[in-house]
């Protein structure tokens, strides 16, 4: 069953481009160390009717087991911990969360 996993964060004022750059860096350096295919990853940014600071990263997964395997894998990558500290400097603390959607059509 195909699903969309979407990670949300809000950039601190004046740091949105830096947060986006760090997210792209994560895709290239850390995401590629996982078994997920990040070629179809999309990054969305708040515009009309959404918070301007909002950034969302979404990618397709086969199911919740694949997402859990992904979480387990990134937890074991030292570079992910270091990246998280840098990302924490440019995003609003407590603003990150995940959503998962089923693809129905």
Where do the model's predicted regions map?
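Pocket-edge positions in alpha/beta enzyme catalytic cores
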Residues: 11, 56-59
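Short glycine-enriched loop/turn motifs at secondary-structure junctions
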Residues: 3, 49-53
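Long, low-complexity, Ser/Thr/Gly/Pro-rich intrinsically disordered segments that act as flexible linkers
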Residues: 96-105
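An amphipathic, aromatic/His-enriched active-site/gating alpha helix that lines ligand/cofactor pockets
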Residues: 25-42, 50-51, 58-97
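Active-site-flanking beta-strand signature of metal-NTP-handling nucleotidyl enzymes
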Residues: 2-10
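Feature marks short, surface-exposed loop/turn motifs that line or immediately flank catalytic pockets
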Residues: 13, 63-65, 104
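Short, surface-exposed ligand-recognition loops at beta-strand->loop->(often short) alpha-helix junctions
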Residues: 12-22
